[in-house]
Amino acid sequence: AEKINATGHPVLRYVGGKISPEMQTPKILWLKENRPHIYQQARHFFDLADYLTWRSTGDEARSVCTVTCKWTYLAHEQRWDAGYFRQIGLAELADEDFVRIGQRIVDPGTPCGDGLCATAAEEMGLPIGTPVAVGMIDAHAGGIGTVGVLNGAVNNMAYVFGTSSCTMTTTQEAVFVPGVWGPYYSAMVPGYWLSEGGQSAAGAAIDQLLSFHPAAAEAREQAKAAGVPLPVWLADRVLTQVASPSEAVTLAAGLHVVPEFLGNRAPLADPHAKALIAGLGMERDLDNLTALYVAGLCGIGYGLRQIIDAQRACGIESENIVISGGAGQHPLVRQLLADACGVSIVSTASR
């Protein structure tokens, strides 16, 4: 990724100015340089969503969502930039007219081939020809499923809070926000631009943080007995100790966490960033573990606030944050994030 960024190629404008090692062209370049025989022998390189539709139908079409957001396809111009691939060291892909990474780029929901092929149908126990649609990246599917509530997509930020987190902000025009991926055309809401941020570790950062504490084993046993995950057990415990969710911050007074165990995805775009815990004492009990959990949630909230502020500085305003994902369902989590960001957080109902 650093080698690619050193080129300063104009395509990088559409990934926030710096490409992330989480994206696919740095990964393919690594493969070429470190496992050249695999690179040379590979017939196709797929994002997961596209692999699944190919595996199911034999159709080699790629989703405009996957290739725009992770592969540097320029959807607003309906093309790959051959000069970019040649400059970064992947000239073969351009010379082959991009046959290995996608020549037919289509919208999510487009029917694939003739539906399920015989092999896939047998493996899944479904009829041959069952319709299969072109897919999306998981977080973007979560975004499209939530961002249209209330006053519509351009007024909401979708926040998919799971193991990692993704922020999805929809605009009518292209907005270039340094350190925030995009703008991507028609990658989530058709006909609109998408700015994508997030945190490389979110729910996973909380899990990592809690694992360091001496009381973690005891807490896990109690959570297991209660039949809930440890973070849920801690959140429930917090609510028994305060009059309202917003007051939970008092439990973590003097304790501060920057939970960037996997770097900063946005808006700093720094994969080398590290986590920080400040304010630790000699405490080893469940109350201190609870305080550490609250401080970690606040740290996640401050990281989300950084993204909102960076986008606001470039003219993007979000009236609401529409949250989805398993880590964002507890009322304590939603309230602490709302307080940190100064923006209302809403959650859609599932049926």
Report the location of each language-model feature.
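Active-site core segments that coordinate phosphate-bearing ligands/cofactors
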Residues: 2-62, 70-97, 106-351
